[in-house]
UniProtKB/Swiss-Prot annotation:
Belongs to the LysR transcriptional regulatory family. Residues 23-42 bind DNA. The keyword DNA-binding applies. This is Probable RuBisCO transcriptional regulator. Trans-acting transcriptional regulator of RuBisCO genes (rbcL and rbcS) expression. Keywords: Chloroplast, DNA-binding, Plastid, Transcription, Transcription regulation.
Amino acid sequence: MTDLPFTLDQLRILRAILIQGSFKKAATSLYISQPAVSSHVHNIEKQLNIQLFDRSHRNAQLTEAGQLLLKYGGRILALCEETCRALEDLQNLQCGNLIIGASQTTGTYLMPKLIGLFRQKYPQISVQLQVHSTRRISWSVANGQLDLAIIGGEVPKELTEILEVRNFVEDELTLILPPSHPFSKFSCIQKEDLYRLRFIALDKNSTIRKVIDKILNRNGIDSSRLKTEMELSSIEAIKNAVQSGLGASFVSISAIDKELKLQLLNRVNIDKIKIKRMLSIITNYSRYRSKASETFCHEILGLLVNLPFKNAPSTEK
């Protein structure tokens, strides 16, 4: 085969369809028309003489051939993107882009502070932050769409051999109450008192919820007996609900600095129980690590917690 039956732009279109779930959304994300997307897909299928999408479904569903093409096409695109970034680093070590991922709470309350420190010292480096679930962020690092990420949960089991995971710092979770609650006058309550509270919590599948339930159960507190009155989708919503007197909750200490200073919320300890989770830095063993990424890890993360960030093992023999 002398001429390739597809271009890099066409591979980008196929990847966008897979990520966005439809031709229309893919077109919007790429700033092109939907007919243009359909035309490119039709041309590839014509060149390959094979169907890439199952059109009997409402959403864009890849056929087996489409999945195979995207498997290798994704690698091609990632390698091209790495090549461009490597050349950019070679041209100017202090220039470039840094794309960081973070899970919800970490991305909302911790990362802006760290990125602020980094930008003060390296204002010429562009930093992008993407905040999603731990699972989605882990896959983005594995696919080369992120340079690194900081997460508060475990990476998917299928990615453990692909991702390098290094513990960063402990994040303490604390019980919060409205100032009007009777327990707010105490600095510490007994674990049995938790059964008397009404709780506002994140979804059961959230990382923080799983950590809290696991630690409470380990300390003799049956999390299934806690009265969960309401489940909300964000920490901000939970804080507002607690401030309004609707119940109590567990949140990261990093999320309530302002509320504690303004006395909008009270933090109450539980006797002999500390609820902590480990935040981890994840990178991809096999991906090129940009100068900006190494600088962020060494000078920002390493500086804050005295953690020297190690490079991935060499593949040279």
